[in-house]
């Protein structure tokens, strides 16, 4: 974190927080930083965390997440995106030995049109009921809902290639 980033939103009516040094490292997790933040703030009904590295999340995406929490459908909501690869066709390689991870390859189930789709957190937002988060220290449980973000808006900027791709979307 740096002053330049922090000052970029100085004119907005939002509460800003600078992470302590131990949460501003490549090995620090977002979850650890959020749990520390929960300990520092006065409690609210819900807690929402929007990652600046995923800038193309829309207001409608955020509203969908908030609605799920308000309707008491869940304890937490996470922005999700479809994984483009067919995970069931994944293999491990040991030297030159191919080791299928799933049994699809051994059973001949290789047509990706008939294989279940998988999703992952998009990096856009994490929302949860305050008390649930304090007690469980995690956003994922049996009562977690997802808001699916289309791949075009699920750009999680972590590398130079990600920056170039994001720039190509706005220029």
Feature roles, as predicted:
Residues 3-48, 56-60, 64:
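Short phosphate-binding loop-to-helix
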Residues 27, 32, 55-149:
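Conserved core of the sugar-phosphate nucleotidyltransferase
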Residues 135-155, 160-171:
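Catalytic donor-sugar/metal-binding loop of nucleotide-sugar-dependent glycosyltransferases
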């Amino acid at each position: 974190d740096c002053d330049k980033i922090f000052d970029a939103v100085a004119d907005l009516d939002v509460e800003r927080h600078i992470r302590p040094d131990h949460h501003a490292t490549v090995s620090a997790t977002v979850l650890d930083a959020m749990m520390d933040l929960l300990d520092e703030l006065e409690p609210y009904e819900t807690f929402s965390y929007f990652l600046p590295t995923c800038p193309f999340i829309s207001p409608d995406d955020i509203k969908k997440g908030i609605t799920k929490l308000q309707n008491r459908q869940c304890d937490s909501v996470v922005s999700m995106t479809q994984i483009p690869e067919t995970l069931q066709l994944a293999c491990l390689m040991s030297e030159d030995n191919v080791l299928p991870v799933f049994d699809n390859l051994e059973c001949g189930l290789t047509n990706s049109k008939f294989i279940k789709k998988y999703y992952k957190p998009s990096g856009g937002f994490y929302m949860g009921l305050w008390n649930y988060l304090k007690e469980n220290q995690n956003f994922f449980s049996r009562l977690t809902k997802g808001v699916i973000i289309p791949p075009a808006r699920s750009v999680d900027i972590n590398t130079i290639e990600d920056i170039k791709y994001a720039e190509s979307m706005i220029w």
